[in-house]
C-alpha cells in the first residue's frame, strides 16, 4: 500500500481525466474518502477527444496506406468505409473503454459525481485536487473553427481542411485526413514539430512522411479562413488554469493541489498527467504526516508522434550519433516498399543521452529510457521475433 493506514479525510478531485482519476484511485485505494467530480465523461480529453480517439483514426489511416502501397495507387477512406461509419465504430470502442474505466474507478472506492464542482462544495472537503484540463479557444481571429471536441462529432469527411497549429496534434490530424483523401493545408507561424531538431531527421520527414501542404504566410492563411469550402480546425495548445509551486500546491490556496493539463506550468501529455496525479496523491499524504513533499520529475519523458511512420524520441539530440537501420516486423512490413524511416541514438561524453526512432513499437522507448538512466535492461535480454525493436541488438550483452 502506498499510504499505510486508512484515512478518514474527505477529498474532492475535480476532473476524471488521466491526472484526476490517477489521484482519486491512489487515494481511495489507501483509505481516503474520495469524490471524483466530472461534468462531461470519464477519461478526459485523452480518451474522448485526444490520443485514444486519434489512435482509432490513425489505425484506419494505416490500413489505407498499406492498401495504397499494395495496389500501387492512392486508396481513399470512402472506398472502404464511410467517415460516418468509422466515427460510429470508434465511438463504440470509446464507450467500452469508458465503461471499463468507470468500473475500475468505482471498484477502488471512488465516488463518481457527474456534475460540476462549484464553490459551494469547497467547505465539504479537507483537500481539493483540480485536474480540469485546459481552456481552449473556440474561434481564431474572429473566425469560427472546430476544436478537438468537435471532430469526433463530424459525420461527413470534409473535402478541404485548414489546420491551424504546428504541434503534435495538428500534425497528426493533418497526416490522418490527408491519408483519408482530403486536401489538407496546415498553417504554422514557424515550423512544425519543433522538438525534433535533428536536421537529417527533419529532412526525411518533410520528403518522405509529411503528406500535406504547409504554409507560413499570414495573407494566405487569411484567404483560406475566408474560403467557405474549407473546414477549419484549430489545433493549438490551450491555456492552463492554475499556477502551482514545485510540489503542485495551488498558489495562495490552502490544501488545494492541481495536476495535469490544467497546470499553467505543467501537464503536456497523458503520462505526464498521470505522474503529476501520483505526485499530488503522495504529497497530500506527506503533508498530513509532516513528511517532506516530493516534486514531479520531468526529465527524460518519452514522446511519440503517430504519422504514416511512428516517430518517437527521448532525451537530447546531439551531433554525436549512430544511425541504426530499421527492423522489419508487425506494423511496417509493407512499408519496406515505400520507406521504413531512419533511427538515431545520440551520445555525449561517451554516454547515451537520447534517441529518435521511426519504429512501429513506440511502447519500447521507455525501456530504452531506463538504459539512459543507467539501468541495464538489455542484460540477458530475450526478444520476440520478428520485432521492430532497434535497441536490443545494439545493447544486448
Swiss-Prot record:
Cystine pairings recorded for this chain: none
Domain of life: Archaea
Pfam families given in the database record: Pyr_redox_2 (PF07992)
A molecular function GO annotation: flavin adenine dinucleotide binding
Species, as recorded: Methanocaldococcus jannaschii (strain ATCC 43067 / DSM 2661 / JAL-1 / JCM 10045 / NBRC 100440)
InterPro entries: Class-I_Pyr_Nuc-Dis_Oxidored, FAD/NAD-bd_sf, FAD/NAD-binding_dom
Name listed for the protein in its UniProt record: Uncharacterized protein MJ0636
Gene Ontology terms describing biological process: 2-oxoglutarate metabolic process; pyruvate metabolic process
Amino acid at each position: 500500500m502506498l499510504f499505510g493506514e486508512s484515512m478518514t479525510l474527505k477529498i474532492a478531485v475535480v476532473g476524471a481525466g488521466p491526472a484526476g482519476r490517477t489521484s482519486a484511485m491512489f487515494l481511495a485505494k489507501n483509505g481516503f474518502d474520495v469524490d471524483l467530480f466530472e461534468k462531461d465523461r470519464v477519461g478526459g480529453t485523452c480518451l474522448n477527444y485526444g490520443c485514444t480517439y486519434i489512435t482509432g483514426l490513425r489505425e484506419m489511416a494505416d490500413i489505407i496506406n498499406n492498401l495504397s502501397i499494395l495496389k500501387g495507387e492512392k486508396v481513399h477512406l470512402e472506398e472502404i468505409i464511410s467517415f460516418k461509419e468509422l466515427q460510429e465504430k470508434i465511438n463504440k470502442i470509446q464507450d467500452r473503454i469508458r465503461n471499463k474505466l468507470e468500473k475500475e474507478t468505482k471498484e477502488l472506492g471512488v465516488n463518481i459525481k457527474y456534475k460540476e464542482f462549484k464553490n459551494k462544495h469547497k467547505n465539504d472537503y479537507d483537500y481539493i485536487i483540480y485536474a480540469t484540463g485546459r481552456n481552449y479557444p473556440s474561434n481564431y481571429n474572429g473566425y469560427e473553427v472546430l476544436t478537438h471536441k468537435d471532430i469526433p462529432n463530424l459525420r461527413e469527411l470534409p473535402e478541404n481542411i485548414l489546420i491551424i497549429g504546428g504541434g503534435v496534434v495538428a500534425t497528426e490530424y493533418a497526416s490522418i485526413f490527408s491519408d483519408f483523401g482530403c486536401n489538407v493545408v496546415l498553417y504554422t507561424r514557424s515550423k512544425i514539430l519543433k522538438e525534433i531538431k535533428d536536421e537529417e531527421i527533419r529532412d526525411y520527414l518533410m520528403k518522405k512522411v509529411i503528406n500535406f501542404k504547409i504554409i507560413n504566410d499570414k495573407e494566405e492563411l487569411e484567404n483560406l479562413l475566408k474560403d467557405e469550402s474549407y473546414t477549419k480546425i484549430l489545433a493549438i495548445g490551450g491555456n492552463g488554469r492554475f499556477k502551482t509551486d514545485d510540489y503542485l500546491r495551488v498558489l495562495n490556496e490552502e490544501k488545494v493541489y492541481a495536476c495535469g493539463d490544467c497546470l499553467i506550468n505543467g501537464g503536456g501529455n497523458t503520462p505526464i498527467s498521470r505522474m503529476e496525479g501520483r505526485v499530488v496523491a503522495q504529497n497530500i499524504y506527506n503533508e498530513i504526516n509532516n513528511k517532506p513533499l516530493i516534486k514531479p520529475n520531468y526529465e527524460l519523458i518519452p514522446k511519440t508522434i503517430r504519422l504514416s511512420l511512428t516517430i518517437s524520441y527521448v532525451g537530447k539530440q546531439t551531433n554525436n550519433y549512430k544511425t541504426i537501420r530499421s527492423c522489419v516486423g508487425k506494423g511496417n512490413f509493407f512499408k519496406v516498399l515505400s520507406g521504413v524511416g531512419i533511427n538515431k541514438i545520440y551520445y555525449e561524453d561517451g554516454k547515451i543521452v537520447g534517441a529518435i526512432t521511426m519504429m512501429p513499437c513506440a511502447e519500447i522507448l521507455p525501456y530504452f529510457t531506463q538504459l539512459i538512466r543507467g539501468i541495464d535492461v538489455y542484460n540477458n535480454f530475450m526478444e520476440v521475433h520478428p520485432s521492430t525493436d532497434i535497441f536490443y541488438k545494439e545493447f544486448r550483452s
